[in-house]
Curated annotation (Swiss-Prot):
Keywords: Cytoplasm, RNA-binding. Belongs to the SmpB family. It comes from the Bacteria. The lineage of its organism: Bacteria, Pseudomonadati, Pseudomonadota, Gammaproteobacteria, Cellvibrionales. One of its GO terms (molecular function) is RNA binding. This is SsrA-binding protein. It comes from Saccharophagus degradans (strain 2-40 / ATCC 43961 / DSM 17024). Its main location: cytoplasm. Required for rescue of stalled ribosomes mediated by trans-translation. Binds to transfer-messenger RNA (tmRNA), required for stable association of tmRNA with ribosomes. tmRNA and SmpB together mimic tRNA shape, replacing the anticodon stem-loop with SmpB. tmRNA is encoded by the ssrA gene; the 2 termini fold to resemble tRNA(Ala) and it encodes a 'tag peptide', a short internal open reading frame. During trans-translation Ala-aminoacylated tmRNA acts like a tRNA, entering the A-site of stalled ribosomes, displacing the stalled mRNA. PROSITE patterns: SSRP. It holds the Pfam family SmpB. GO terms for biological process: trans-translation. Transmembrane segments: none annotated. It is found in: Cytoplasm. InterPro entries: SmpB, SsrA-bd_prot, SsrA-bd_prot_CS.
Length: 159
């Protein structure tokens, strides 16, 4: 069978999502950043071994770093050196975006969270967002709105 006749499996471009960020924060401005990874990390991400539940972005010395993202190594991929699953990874942004992020982080109540990790062509990209923390009553309001939208859909579907 030639290579032209082989069918490729459609792969989802999303590697990992931080659903907790959508629950705990109001996400305002979003940015797309490249991620500087090692070879074993790319292999592990291709095997869907990434996790972003408590990841955030730290700005130090004019550079952005992804903190708290876990990439579990494959046992066969990294036998000759020590791997660190939770190491800080550098985010690749242009200067204008870095300045906006640093300025927003200095405002009271704002933080920078990583919302998702995905493939764009053959590169790993990270979507980051400027976020403001939600209070308990904000979370309840969001839940009520979500339930109301579900009820509206049910009524429209029944008709």
């Amino acid at each position: 069978m030639s290579k032209a006749n082989k069918k490729k499996k459609p792969q989802s471009s999303t590697i990992a999502q931080n659903k907790r960020a959508r629950h705990d924060y109001f996400l305002e401005t979003k940015f797309e950043a490249g991620v500087a990874l090692l070879g074993w990390e790319v292999k592990a991400l291709r095997a869907q071994r990434g996790q972003m539940t408590e990841s955030y972005v730290l700005v130090q010395n004019g550079e952005a770093w992804l903190q708290g993202a876990q990439i579990q190594p494959l046992p066969q991929a990294c036998t000759h050196y020590v791997t660190e699953p939770a190491r800080p990874r550098k985010l690749l942004l242009n200067r204008r975006e870095l300045n906006k992020i640093a300025e927003a982080k200095d405002q009271k109540g704002y933080t920078i969270v990583a919302t998702s990790l995905y493939w764009k062509a053959h590169m790993v990209k990270c979507e980051i967002a400027i976020a403001k923390g939600k209070q308990l009553h904000d979370k309840r309001q969001t839940e009520k709105e979500r339930e109301w939208n579900i009820q509206k859909q049910r009524v429209l579907y029944d008709k």
